[in-house]
Regions:
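Glycine-rich oxoanion-binding loops at beta->alpha junctions
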Residues: 54-63, 119
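Short alpha-helices
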Residues: 102-167
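Glycine-rich, phosphate-binding/catalytic loops in enzymes
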Residues: 35-36, 93-96, 114-115, 166
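Hydrophobic residues at beta-strand termini and immediately following loops
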Residues: 49, 99, 113-114, 215
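Hydrophobic helix-and-loop "lid/oligomerization" segment in the mid-to-C-terminal part
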Residues: 2-24, 28-57, 68-75, 150-277, ...
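Active-site cofactor/cluster-binding pocket
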Residues: 59-111
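Short, hinge-like loop/turn segments at secondary-structure boundaries
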Residues: 64-67, 114-116, 266-267
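Short, motif-level signal for alpha-helix interfacial/capping segments enriched in acidic residues
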Residues: 1-5, 78-79, 129-131
């Protein structure tokens, strides 16, 4: 399905519940909210699934679109959700349309708008809104700027390309307050987050002459820093600050004792292939998985696979 066909499909239906993924980031939430706004502008009933895991800094931008308790949807739309295992709660068989940019999308929805060449879902939603409405409101521009900028690390990640920057420029022209949003999402941090980063950096490990960097975040570290879920956004970017690092591994201990692994890499290494060994996936240069063991063991396991794949 292309953008034009998706827009026509959305015009023919109604009563949409728009669904984000587990541990939602700026791309899934910004894209969901912008699409919701556009659908309402063309006379459709649309609401967001009120994902309980949304971090505090995102809430002011998205909670106005949350579905009320009595909302009964006729159709589910998943945005930036590569597989049905990534839903915040059970939506199996309830999603008719998926809009995504992950090349590993499992094609679980009846209809799929997939653009794996895009750095973010926000870029796809920008095209879709222009097809639906002809223009983009200032509020939608802010939401989509959040989406695009957070999925590209404020345009520092390798997934950023000329098309990404052109999309950001269009959003700026539509009124996105880029400078304000950059401060909120990339510069300002809580005291707990800064304490946690200090612990993370002091415990960073390096392998293969610094080409592989690994950081681990344990439950004990979170407790000592006084950090909450709101302080954990984009922890995966920390390992990549090492100057020689080509493969960056972030391992976070989850409440059940398992480890969430985020992997970012240069073009020489396929992150998605490595994470697929553990049932995960994502993009070539940014992927993730969950390993059912403590962080120390997860580090050994993921390093073994990296060294096997990257000779």
């Amino acid at each position: 399905m292309n953008v034009k066909a998706c827009a026509e499909y959305l015009k023919k239906n109604d009563n949409y519940l728009i669904v984000s993924h587990k541990n939602p980031d700026g791309d899934t939430m910004g894209s969901c909210a912008a699409l919701c706004s556009a659908l309402r502008r063309v006379g459709k009933k649309a609401c967001l699934y009120p994902n309980p895991q949304v971090i505090k800094k995102l809430l002011p931008y998205v909670e106005k679109y949350y579905a009320p308790d009595d909302f009964v949807p006729s159709m589910g739309i998943a945005v930036d959700v590569a597989t049905d295992k990534m839903f915040a709660q059970g939506f199996d068989g309830k999603v008719q349309l998926c809009i995504d940019h992950h090349p590993t999308n499992s094609r679980y929805a009846k209809k799929l708008l997939l653009k794996p060449e895009k750095a973010s879902c926000g870029e796809i939603i920008l095209e879709l809104i222009k097809s639906l409405c002809g223009d983009v409101t200032r509020e939608e521009a802010d939401l989509l700027y959040i989406a695009v900028s957070t999925d590209t690390g404020c345009f520092m990640y390798a997934n950023t390309c000329s098309a990404t920057l052109r999309a950001a420029a269009k959003l700026y022209d539509y009124g996105a307050e880029a400078a304000v949003l950059n401060q909120i999402f990339f510069r300002k941090k809580s005291a707990a987050r800064l304490k946690l980063e200090g612990m993370v950096f002091s415990g960073m490990s390096f392998y293969r002459d610094g080409k592989i960097s690994v950081v681990k975040i344990t439950k004990d570290m979170l407790s000592k820093a006084g950090a909450t879920n709101d302080d954990l956004d984009d922890l995966a970017g920390l390992a990549g600050m090492a100057e020689k690092s080509l493969v960056n591994v972030t391992i976070r201990e989850l409440d059940d004792g398992s480890s969430k692994v985020s992997l970012r890499s240069s073009k020489e290494v396929n992150s998605s292939d490595i994470c697929a060994v553990f049932g995960g996936g994502g993009h070539n240069m940014a992927a993730g998985c969950t390993i059912n063991c403590p962080p120390d063991k997860a580090e050994t396991m993921i390093l073994d696979v990296i060294n096997e794949v990257w000779k």
